[in-house]
């Protein structure tokens, strides 16, 4: 075991696979351009918020200033606890979302979702499409 710095903090091999994956990821982002990725995800986020706002059974938790809001949307449903809704969307509709407190339990105390199990979080990625969002909306409508 190394006893001197910096070897003391790096006694094992470097994670070459992760380093290579990070390099490939950064190369892809540069190739696509951060601006292009941002614009696309912003358009999808705005579309999702607009469509979700049409559903009376859904409550959205959004920032007051949505100018730079992209990719993450938290919601609750009047008929289901977050973990129930996430399970139904996954098992019955093949839609992946996350439920719970999302590593931020104090935020849920602040927004009033602490006792109901948190929220359902939708994460929009670059490879998502409006059809994916429409599938989510159709699933939520079917559950009303």
Give a label for each model feature.
Residues 1-144:
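Pyridoxal 5′-phosphate
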């Amino acid at each position: 075991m190394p006893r001197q710095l910096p070897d003391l903090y790096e006694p094992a091999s470097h994670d070459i696979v992760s380093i290579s994956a990070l390099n490939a990821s950064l190369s892809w982002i540069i190739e696509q351009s951060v601006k292009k990725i941002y614009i696309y995800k912003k358009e999808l986020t705005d579309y999702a918020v607009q469509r979700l706002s049409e559903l009376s059974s859904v409550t959205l938790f959004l920032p007051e200033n949505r100018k730079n809001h992209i990719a993450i949307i938290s919601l609750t449903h009047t008929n289901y606890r977050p973990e129930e809704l996430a399970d139904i969307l996954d098992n019955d509709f093949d839609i992946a979302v996350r439920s719970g407190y999302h590593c931020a339990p104090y935020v849920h105390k602040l927004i009033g979702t602490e006792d109901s199990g948190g929220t359902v979080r939708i994460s929009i990625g670059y490879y998502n499409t409006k059809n994916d969002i429409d599938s989510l909306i159709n699933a939520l409508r079917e559950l009303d």
